[in-house]
UniProtKB/Swiss-Prot annotation:
HAMAP family: SmpB. Keywords: Cytoplasm, RNA-binding. This is SsrA-binding protein. It is found in: Cytoplasm. PANTHER family: SSRA-BINDING PROTEIN, TMRNA-BINDING COMPONENT OF TRANS-TRANSLATION TAGGING COMPLEX. Gene3D superfamilies: 2.40.280.10. The keyword RNA-binding applies. The keyword Cytoplasm applies. Belongs to the SmpB family. The gene is smpB.
Length: 153
């Protein structure tokens, strides 16, 4: 992300469900009504992921709500959207995705300093159930430490 960015949506489950190994930024192909919906905050990327199809990267399962003023020119809320990346970046991603168990997860959607919509993607590997339990224990222990320190002073 650059100097200024306005985060519109975040995938908070991603850091809990996956080990994020690498992060990258990609542009996204949108229709006019989709852009207006994103500006109004009607977007969710909870279960969205990116995958390769015919040497291009597409974003699946992302939700961008309908824009009410667009009437008949409105878009489909859950459609497959093309991501804009350089050819070398796409080849690098395809190489990394060939590793077993790796996936490309959408981490956030934001406006960059030039007011363009960008998607932050994370190359992720799934966590096992015991990894998730360990993460929960760690979070609770940190909260408990903070409470103890607060009561000490």
């Amino acid at each position: 992300m650059e100097n200024y960015c306005k985060i519109v949506a975040q995938n908070r489950k991603a850091k809990f469900n996956y080990f994020i190994q690498d992060k990258m930024e990609a542009g996204i192909v949108l229709q006019g009504s989709e852009l207006k919906s994103i500006r109004s905050g009607k977007v969710s990327i909870e279960d969205s992921y990116a995958a390769e199809s015919s040497n291009e990267i597409f974003l699946y399962n992302s939700y961008i709500g309908e824009y009410k003023q667009a009437n008949r020119f409105n878009h489909v809320p859950r459609r497959v959207r093309k991501l804009l990346l350089h050819r070398k970046e796409i080849q690098k991603i395809i190489g990394k995705l060939s590793v077993q168990g790796c996936t490309l997860v959408a981490l956030s959607i934001y406006f960059n300093s030039k007011n363009k919509v960008k998607v932050e993607l994370g190359l992720a590997k799934g966590k096992k159930q015991y990894d998730k339990r360990y993460a929960i224990k760690e979070q609770e222990w940190k909260k408990q430490q903070a409470r103890i320190m607060r009561n000490k002073f």
